């Protein structure tokens, strides 16, 4: 179980894990690794005086209304549910529909007070293998601050068909003095990719540092 895993690894996870202000007014609900990016942005915003949080769903099936109700802050006024899929023909994406139904179920069964009536909006992110960046996560929180938040939006892709994508500041970055980032450009067959792959392996194996690399190839031939 998760408790045993935590004791063995030092990493403790819950099926429904909330991170953020205990009295958050804006909450993002999502699954997957993108939640960690959103948590970092939430921490930044909380230090700036906002009241936000992130609820990570690690157990989608069976979905536990009780665990969800225990994890969600009852101070939430706006909840954004992010799905990494587009469900054509449905009223919303799977997690969005699950959260909306769970809030209603929890209120009817007494797990949440009937006064708990947040605005629940849905969004899609990282579609088409797009990156999900801190700038996009901040855009999601900014959308919740609007007088009329955009619902069923996309972030990261400019939706010129339905015009339902939200804008964000692409220059926004989370600066961490303990992190070193670098961008390397190379031409075809010049050895840049191979050299960087070996560099990352050396850093990861021979030092106590954590290393990550991401490579992008265009269609031009060498």
Where are these regions (language model features)?
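Generic recognition of flexible, low-complexity loop/linker segments
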Residues: 13-18, 67-69, 169-174, 182-184
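A structural-propensity feature for long, helix-poor, extended segments
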Residues: 68-87, 215-222
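Solvent-exposed alpha-helices and their adjacent loops that cap or buttress functional pockets
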Residues: 18-23, 71-74, 111-114, 147, ...
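Peripheral docking tails and interdomain loops at the edges
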Residues: 78-175
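Short glycine/threonine-rich loop-to-helix capping motif typified by GTGT followed
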Residues: 32, 42-43, 63-74, 92-94, ...
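Conformationally flexible catalytic loops at phosphate/diphosphate-handling active centers
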Residues: 1-18
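Core nucleotide-handling region used for phosphoryl-transfer chemistry
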Residues: 48-78
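Anionic-ligand anchoring segments at beta-strand to alpha-helix junctions in alpha/beta enzyme folds, i.e.
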Residues: 29-58, 178-222
């Amino acid at each position: 179980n998760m408790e045993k895993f935590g004791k063995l690894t030092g990493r403790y996870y819950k099926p429904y894990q909330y991170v953020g202000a205990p009295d958050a007014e804006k909450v993002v609900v999502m699954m997957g690794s993108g939640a960690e990016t959103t948590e970092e942005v939430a921490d930044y915003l909380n230090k700036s005086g906002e009241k936000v949080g992130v609820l990570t769903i690690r157990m989608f099936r069976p979905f536990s209304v009780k665990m969800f109700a225990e994890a969600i802050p009852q101070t939430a006024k706006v909840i954004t549910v992010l799905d990494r899929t587009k469900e054509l023909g449905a009223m919303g994406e799977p997690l969005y529909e699950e959260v909306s139904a769970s809030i209603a179920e929890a209120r009817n069964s007494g797990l949440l007070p009937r006064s708990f009536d947040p605005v629940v909006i849905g969004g899609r992110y990282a579609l088409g293998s797009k990156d999900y960046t801190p700038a996009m996560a901040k855009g999601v929180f900014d959308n919740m601050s609007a007088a009329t938040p955009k619902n069923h939006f996309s972030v990261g892709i400019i939706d010129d068909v339905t015009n339902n994508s939200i804008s964000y500041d692409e220059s926004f970055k989370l600066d961490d003095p303990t992190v070193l980032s670098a961008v390397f450009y190379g031409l075809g067959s010049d050895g840049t990719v191979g050299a960087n792959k070996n560099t990352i392996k050396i850093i990861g194996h021979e030092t106590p540092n954590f290393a990550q690399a991401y490579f992008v190839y265009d269609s031009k031939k060498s």
